[in-house]
Amino acid sequence: SIRKQALWNGILMASIVLDNRGNLISVPILTELGISKTEKMKNALLEISLKIEDYIEGLNDTQTLDDDDLKEILKKIILKEIKILFSIRPVVNIHINRVQ
């Protein structure tokens, strides 16, 4: 269940702010709960944020319009990096905020 997964692997949240054309307005913000409070985690979150930024900036306008597809791809990017570094699969929540 999600509760057990969160208990054993933690939770990672990403907040992405886009304009109505899909351009990033600010740097993606990542926070974790119950994974690691180490410098390694801080560096990992920064690195993942940069990867998300690079990925979104490489998309065309129509690819950034579908929030569900974008969330799934970003979730895969996050999980891949966290699994490599920490050998866990946290619950990942992605919030996409659109600003006019």
Say what each PLM segment does:
Residues 1-100:
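Acidic/His-rich, metal-assisted hydrolase cores and their charged scaffolds
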